[in-house]
Amino acid sequence: MKGPTLALFLLLVLLAVVEVRSRQTVKLCGLDYVRTVIYICASSRWRRHLEGHFHSQQAETRNYLQLLDRHEPSKKTLEHSLPKTDLSGQELVRDPQAPKEGLWELKKHSVVSRRDLQALCCREGCSMKELSTLC
């Protein structure tokens, strides 16, 4: 009876330590910030997630190319049917009636928020969970 109780206790302590570490803030500036973000985003968990997303995008592209062979749509039709993605591979949702300047504003906002997080990490510190939002 003592063995399972001790094992359960040690497991709970381990989980508590992991939770505290994820909440800890670390001040990261310059190259340390960049290295940490790359380390977090390049972990095997993120790579598996991105590989799955990449394969689904390839399948979608293949389907669009097959449609192209059959129907040969105009350039304008093709622009509206293909999914729009940003540099991170995330799909952008955009109203076809909205002006094109809105897309630039979206990208500018993304870059600004990343710069803000970098400045905040350097000044006050940030947690690993906050850094993982950049992936």
UniProtKB/Swiss-Prot annotation:
One of its GO terms (molecular function) is hormone activity. It holds the Pfam family Insulin. Keywords: Cleavage on pair of basic residues, Disulfide bond, Hormone, Secreted, Signal. GO terms for cellular component: collagen-containing extracellular matrix; extracellular region. Residues 49-114 form a propeptide. Highest expression in colon with lower levels in thymus. Minimal levels in testis. It is found in: Secreted. The keyword Secreted applies. Disulfide bonds join 29-122, 41-135, 121-126. The keyword Secreted applies. SMART domains: IlGF. Residues 1-22 form the signal peptide. Its main location: secreted. GO terms for biological process: positive regulation of feeding behavior. Belongs to the insulin family. May have a role in gut contractility or in thymic development and regulation. Activates RXFP4 with high potency and appears to be the endogenous ligand for this receptor. Heterodimer of a B chain and an A chain linked by two disulfide bonds. This is Insulin-like peptide INSL5. It comes from Mus musculus.
